């Protein structure tokens, strides 16, 4: 099958879910608009903020590109884990553990540098401006605390899902971040530090940032958020495409299935 035929087939596979996502965004905008109008009629002070639509031309491009990233991703369940180039970000909670000593803040490294031959590596991809990702960070922290005796954990900070100067989302909660598009590696690392200031992670969790060529994002087909588990340099678990298929409960189930309760408590 030629490349043109493959591209056409992938496009036809993407179209139904793409249109369903567009419908969801339209419904979301309708609900928010009705809520906004109701607050205006009630003369509530909470209506002073700007109303932002989600169904925009830039939003459609982002959604479409996210499906393309997922379709063309290199990572496959049971196959070799891509050893993407990343940049180390210091975790304020980390002490002088072995990983921190080997990798200085801002130093270039590779994703599999954090993998152990005997322990699985849980890799969590996301950014501060992705609400589904930030909402799950407390659950991710709990996973690290409960399973760090049997597994290693890595957070990979990627390109912003909803930068304030791009496809921004309404800032209506304490989880909201105002982060612009990353112009350079320093911007990306600064955004990662901003996330860690709001959501502290246990010292057992290492943090890195994707390079500006987004090689980790492309290899793992992340787009918005994704989680996977690497074991013996193979993909032992591959989570679905975020936001709708991003599921940390599946990670917990995998860890519980593969490790006894006694080992976890140890």
Curated annotation (Swiss-Prot):
The keyword Ion transport does not apply. It holds the Pfam family T4_deiodinase. It is found in: Endoplasmic reticulum membrane. GO terms for molecular function: thyroxine 5'-deiodinase activity. GO terms for cellular component: endoplasmic reticulum membrane; plasma membrane. One of its GO terms (biological process) is lipid metabolic process. The active site is at residue 130. It is an enzyme of class 1 (oxidoreductase). Residues 35-266 are cytoplasmic. Keywords: Endoplasmic reticulum, Membrane, Oxidoreductase, Selenocysteine, Thyroid hormones biosynthesis, Transmembrane, Transmembrane helix, Ubl conjugation. Its EC number is 1.21.99.4. It is a single-pass type III membrane protein. InterPro entries: Iodothyronine_deiodinase, Iodothyronine_deiodinase_AS, Thioredoxin-like_sf. It catalyses: 3,3',5-triiodo-L-thyronine + iodide + A + H(+) = L-thyroxine + AH2; 3,3'-diiodo-L-thyronine + iodide + A + H(+) = 3,3',5'-triiodo-L-thyronine + AH2; 3'-iodo-L-thyronine + iodide + A + H(+) = 3',5'-diiodo-L-thyronine + AH2; 3,3'-diiodothyronamine + iodide + A + H(+) = 3,3',5'-triiodothyronamine + AH2. Ubiquitinated by MARCHF6, leading to its degradation by the proteasome. Deubiquitinated by USP20 and USP33. Expressed in mammary gland and in brain. Plays a crucial role in the metabolism of thyroid hormones (TH) and has specific roles in TH activation and inactivation by deiodination. Catalyzes the deiodination of L-thyroxine (T4) to 3,5,3'-triiodothyronine (T3) and 3,3',5'-triiodothyronine (rT3) to 3,3'-diiodothyronine (3,3'-T2) via outer-ring deiodination (ORD). Catalyzes the deiodination of 3',5'-diiodothyronine (3',5'-T2) to 3'-monoiodothyronine (3'-T1) via ORD. Catalyzes the phenolic ring deiodinations of 3,3',5'-triiodothyronamine and 3',5'- diiodothyronamine. This is Type II iodothyronine deiodinase.
């Amino acid at each position: 099958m030629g490349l043109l035929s493959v591209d056409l087939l992938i496009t036809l596979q993407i179209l139904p879910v793409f249109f369903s996502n567009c419908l969801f965004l339209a419904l979301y905008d309708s609900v928010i608009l009705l809520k906004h109008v109701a607050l205006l009629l009630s003369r509530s002070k909470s209506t002073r903020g700007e109303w932002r639509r989600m169904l925009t031309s830039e939003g459609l491009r982002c959604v479409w590109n996210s499906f393309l990233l997922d379709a063309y991703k290199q990572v496959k369940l049971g196959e070799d884990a891509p050893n993407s180039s990343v940049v180390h970000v210091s975790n304020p909670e980390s002490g002088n553990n072995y990983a921190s000593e080997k990798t200085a803040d801002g130093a270039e490294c590779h994703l599999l540098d954090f993998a152990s031959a005997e322990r699985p590596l849980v890799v969590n991809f996301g950014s501060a401006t992705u609400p589904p990702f930030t909402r799950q960070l407390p659950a991710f922290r709990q996973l690290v605390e409960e399973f760090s005796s049997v597994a290693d954990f890595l957070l990979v900070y990627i390109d912003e899902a909803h930068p304030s100067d791009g496809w921004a989302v309404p800032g209506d909660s304490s989880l909201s971040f105002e982060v612009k598009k990353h112009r350079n590696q320093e911007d990306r690392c600064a955004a990662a530090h901003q996330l860690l200031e709001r959501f502290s992670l246990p010292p057992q969790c290492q943090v890195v940032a994707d390079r500006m060529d987004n090689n980790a994002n492309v290899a793992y087909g992340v787009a918005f958020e994704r989680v996977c588990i690497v074991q013996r340099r193979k993909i032992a678990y591959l989570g679905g495409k975020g936001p709708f298929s991003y599921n940390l409960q599946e990670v917990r189930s995998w860890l519980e299935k593969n490790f006894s309760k006694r080992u976890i408590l140890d």
